[in-house]
């Protein structure tokens, strides 16, 4: 699909366009090098028949590369209204799905809430903008106007990959919270996953990416590791130096692919239960687990026997299936303390 996209603004132009100081404006660490953004999009494979959800497009560096790659449909989710002018220019250039000229398809959050937005926006527009906090957005509300949902009880439908890819240079401050939101959606097969197994191509702080791919027994192995690997196959695609971002952050970043598993590792326990058990027990990761597990309540050592876990292991040595077994034992524990949260 051929189109003419405007050039990326310089840093000075960004500051003038949005009327902000460099320190305030650039705290979001933009990727403005099209060689890098093109490489990220190539990692996503063929997008010509896919809907892409881009998280946090900012001024549109990665957005441009997604459009250039020929994505059939692009929905960008952006919280900061200061980026609207840049994104609207891109939407105008993108036109409609059928190649016809663009028509108005944007409504501000002040005009309608996120749930109403998509019912007003013409579906034929190739690029659509959702002005909202991605932590609060229900992707199902967006995608139901584009794709038909699968039967969540039909294993065969879940085995097939959805024609949806989620791409984003995630704000470091919310990357863990956002990942957990998506994991809960994967398990419940709602949100974007109401339509099948959608792949993620995401930029994380390198430290977080290393936790996502970690193995048992390493210092990076953590609660986030267990929760993510239970439900997704995770692979690091590349490391990207901090110098590639504007402004340069104090840390490097990594590009990660996450693909929902057809069948979860270990027993399938509710994500909130697994999260709670991991959070409590990983808090004492260097102690033997027969001591660490006591953070779940008095006499919680019985859970180790029920889960067939060696009590002399340390939390960081448990495999993902073993963590799932422990969470299931906790879920079924008849003597959970009264102060335990409802999960």
Curated annotation (Swiss-Prot):
Superkingdom, natural source: Eukaryota
Query: Would you tell me the Gene Ontology cellular component terms?
Result: mitochondrial matrix
Example GO BP: transcription initiation at mitochondrial promoter
The catalytic activity of this protein is classed by the Enzyme Commission as 2.1.1.-
Localization annotation:
Mitochondrion
Gene3D superfamilies (alphabetical): Ribosomal RNA adenine dimethylase-like, domain 2, Vaccinia Virus protein VP39
Q: Where does S-adenosyl-L-methionine bind?
A: 28-31, 56, 78, 133, 169
* Key words of the record: Methyltransferase, Mitochondrion, RNA-binding, rRNA processing, S-adenosyl-L-methionine, Transcription, Transcription regulation, Transferase, Transit peptide
**Molecular function in Gene Ontology:** mitochondrial transcription factor activity; RNA binding; rRNA (adenine-N6,N6-)-dimethyltransferase activity
Keyword Transcription present in the record's keywords: the answer is yes
Pfam families annotated for this entry?
A: RrnaAD
Its biological purpose? Probable S-adenosyl-L-methionine-dependent methyltransferase which specifically dimethylates mitochondrial 12S rRNA at the conserved stem loop. Also required for basal transcription of mitochondrial DNA. Stimulates transcription independently of the methyltransferase activity.
Q: Which family does it belong to?
A: Belongs to the class I-like SAM-binding methyltransferase superfamily. rRNA adenine N(6)-methyltransferase family. KsgA subfamily.
Q: What protein name is recorded for this chain?
A: Dimethyladenosine transferase 1, mitochondrial
**Species of the source:** Vermamoeba vermiformis (Amoeba)
Taxonomic lineage from the root: Eukaryota, Amoebozoa, Tubulinea, Echinamoebida, Vermamoeba
């Amino acid at each position: 699909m051929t189109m003419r996209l405007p050039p990326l603004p310089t840093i000075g132009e960004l500051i003038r366009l949005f009327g902000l100081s460099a320190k305030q404006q650039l705290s979001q660490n933009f990727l403005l090098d099209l060689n890098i953004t093109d490489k990220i999009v190539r990692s996503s494979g063929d997008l010509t028949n896919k809907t892409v959800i881009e998280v946090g497009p900012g001024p549109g560096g990665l957005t441009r590369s997604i459009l250039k790659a020929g994505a059939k449909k692009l929905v960008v989710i952006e919280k900061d209204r200061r980026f609207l002018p840049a994104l609207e220019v891109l939407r105008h250039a993108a036109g409609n799905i059928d190649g016809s000229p663009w028509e108005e398809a944007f409504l501000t959050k002040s005009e309608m809430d996120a749930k109403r937005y998509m019912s007003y926006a013409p579906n034929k527009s190739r690029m659509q903008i959702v002005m909202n906090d991605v932590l609060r957005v229900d992707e199902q509300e967006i995608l139901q106007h584009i794709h038909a949902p699968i039967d969540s009880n039909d294993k065969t439908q879940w085995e097939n990959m959805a024609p949806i890819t989620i791409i984003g240079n995630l704000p470091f401050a919310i990357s863990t919270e956002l990942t957990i939101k998506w994991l809960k959606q994967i398990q419940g097969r709602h949100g974007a996953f109401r339509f099948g197994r959608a792949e993620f191509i995401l930029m994380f702080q390198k430290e977080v990416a290393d936790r996502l791919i970690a193995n048992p027994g390493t210092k990076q192995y953590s609660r986030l590791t267990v929760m993510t690997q239970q439900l997704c196959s995770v692979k690091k695609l590349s490391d990207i130096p901090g110098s590639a971002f504007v402004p340069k952050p104090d840390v490097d970043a990594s590009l990660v692919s996450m693909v929902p598993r057809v069948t979860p590792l270990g027993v399938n326990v509710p994500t909130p239960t697994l999260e709670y058990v991991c959070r409590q027990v990983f808090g004492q990761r260097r102690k033997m687990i027969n001591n660490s597990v006591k953070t779940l309540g008095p006499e919680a050592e019985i859970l180790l026997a029920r889960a067939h876990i060696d009590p002399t292991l340390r939390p960081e040595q448990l495999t993902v299936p073993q963590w799932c077994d422990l969470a299931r034992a906790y879920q079924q524990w008849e003597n959970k303390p009264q102060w335990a949260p409802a999960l």
